[in-house]
Amino acid sequence: MLRSVWNFLKRHKKKCIFLGTVLGGVYILGKYGQKKIREIQEREAAEYIAQARRQYHFESNQRTCNMTVLSMLPTLREALMQQLNSESLTALLKNRPSNKLEIWEDLKIISFTRSTVAVYSTCMLVVLLRVQLNIIGGYIYLDNAAVGKNGTTILAPPDVQQQYLSSIQHLLGDGLTELITVIKQAVQKVLGSVSLKHSLSLLDLEQKLKEIRNLVEQHKSSSWINKDGSKPLLCHYMMPDEETPLAVQACGLSPRDITTIKLLNETRDMLESPDFSTVLNTCLNRGFSRLLDNMAEFFRPTEQDLQHGNSMNSLSSVSLPLAKIIPIVNGQIHSVCSETPSHFVQDLLTMEQVKDFAANVYEAFSTPQQLEK
């Protein structure tokens, strides 16, 4: 039996060698294919887990953004009410002073300035914090992902995070003061000559606010210039025009300072981007629309108007003397800068454009390949 097998192999030696080679190759290829399939499956599973982890971290970061905005609104409201103190003027009016008309004129300017600044500063706060917390959130994600790896350097240690995030104080301090000055000048120009007895409809009020916005957003006080020669929208109120105090120091910068300066420069780049201007402008449009919605209830037609056939679909038929509109406008700050989620703040926090922009910022700073560019 063995001899016949041996003779068969000798007679078909080349065929047997070829067959053995083919079978061996098939076996090796099969093993190699199985190994590659396992590697692909493991890589896909790792990528899925990493993506899920990053998505969870992103969503958690957005909740932190929302909570931070709400926690800072009382500080913003207090700063506004301190610099634009209309309450002291209303208290004076209760005493029937001889210069009542002069006080009413001051109250007119301060009331419109305060509500307009409230809309601008709240929108800026929402979008700026989205940028800052998603930049730092991206770095924190990379730091967490690198835990346990040898030779890795922490990108954003806690002291750097604190130093970087403290830059928001510019918006609540010098930036807010400058914004108040510019808006007050615009309000004076648009409404200064309007008599307290002059009646305005809601549409008239909307037009006046548009005129104020045009003056504010075309103001040329900023030295910020984009690479294409254009001026970024309102950026100098959120970050100072000049170099940061840290960067001014020619020497003696600590590694923490250098990292903070890098984060601030990256923030500047984001603020100068067309996407940021688009999102901020969208927020401002929504904010002023919501402000008008809040005041619309005071422009409802009365029963007498309805009986006389003045029931138009719009509220253009209902007009109020400016003196009656001033208290309405003056009280809007409590709705705009409310730490209890009002319709105004809720609208800004849940806007799809804001969410998409936040996702893009987080994506850019939570991907190592992007940071290396």
Swiss-Prot record:
What protein does this entry describe? Answer: Peroxisomal biogenesis factor 3
- Regions that span the bilayer: 16-36, 117-140
Record's bilayer topology term: Multi-pass membrane protein
| Annotated region (Targeting to peroxisomes), positions in chain | 1-45
Q: Where is region (Interaction with PEX19) located? A: 120-136
Give its localization: Peroxisome membrane
- List all topological domains (Cytoplasmic): 1-15, 141-373
Regarding protein family, the annotation reads: Belongs to the peroxin-3 family.
Quick one: which gene encodes this? PEX3
- Reported effect, residue 134 to D: Abolishes binding to PEX19 without affecting targeting to peroxisomes
Q: Which cysteines are joined by disulfide bonds?
A: none
Provide the free-text tissue specificity comment from this protein's UniProt record: Found in all examined tissues.
- From the UniProt record, give one GO term of the biological process aspect: peroxisome organization
List the GO terms this entry assigns under cellular component, sorted alphabetically: endoplasmic reticulum; membrane; nucleoplasm; peroxisomal membrane; peroxisome; protein-containing complex; protein-lipid complex
Complexes and interactors: Interacts with PEX19.
Q: What is the disorder linked to it?
A: Peroxisome biogenesis disorder complementation group 12: A peroxisomal disorder arising from a failure of protein import into the peroxisomal membrane or matrix. The peroxisome biogenesis disorders (PBD group) are genetically heterogeneous with at least 14 distinct genetic groups as concluded from complementation studies. Include disorders are: Zellweger syndrome (ZWS), neonatal adrenoleukodystrophy (NALD), infantile Refsum disease (IRD), and classical rhizomelic chondrodysplasia punctata (RCDP).
Which residues face the membrane's Peroxisomal side? 37-116
Question: Which Gene Ontology MF annotations are present?
Answer: lipid binding; protein-macromolecule adaptor activity
Q: Which of UniProt's keywords are assigned here?
A: Disease variant, Membrane, Peroxisome, Peroxisome biogenesis, Peroxisome biogenesis disorder, Transmembrane, Transmembrane helix, Zellweger syndrome
Cited InterPro entries: Peroxin-3
User: Cross-referenced Pfam families, in alphabetical order?
Assistant: Peroxin-3 (PF04882)
The UniProt-reported impact of residue 125 to P is: Abolishes binding to PEX19 without affecting targeting to peroxisomes
Q: What does this protein do?
A: Involved in peroxisome biosynthesis and integrity. Assembles membrane vesicles before the matrix proteins are translocated. As a docking factor for PEX19, is necessary for the import of peroxisomal membrane proteins in the peroxisomes.
